[in-house]
């Protein structure tokens, strides 16, 4: 059994904790995750590894439903945290985790992503205060950060207001890509974590706007 668990842990399917094991497997079979999760997985995983290092034990963390944020959530399973999320797939990861407290935000559930959004979600979030909010985005241009749903960006703005620190996690393919709904200006988040394939021009641009962290390891893996 121990050997089987070690193999599953190497595959990132489970996370072993003291006295037990927790599921931390792949994203659920929702259109949002099925179409995106396999793409640029190495980049998303590198970004997630950097993001979880910013989160301290006993932090209150608010997580959205992006595929990169889901990777962050997988790596947080088993840690003593207060987790708040708008995303049902993320909530499912922590539902059986006795080491963390879980609050699930309700509202209008998007069937593609399993994410709560809209006025009910915004109302619940407005009554909360968290240490860190972690968000994914669909696009980044000179005009700012974008996502692909008007209700979603309204909810994410409430998530930003609720946090002492806002962390955006985005792989380098998002730069120069515009999506439907404008979320915020480039300098609005406190921190942006990207992979090491970010174009140099964007690296300089974003470094002038906010705290930019470049997650290393992707280029090295491709060389090897």
Report each predicted region and the residues it spans.
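Short glycine/serine/threonine-rich phosphate/pyrophosphate-binding segments
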Residues: 68-72, 175-178
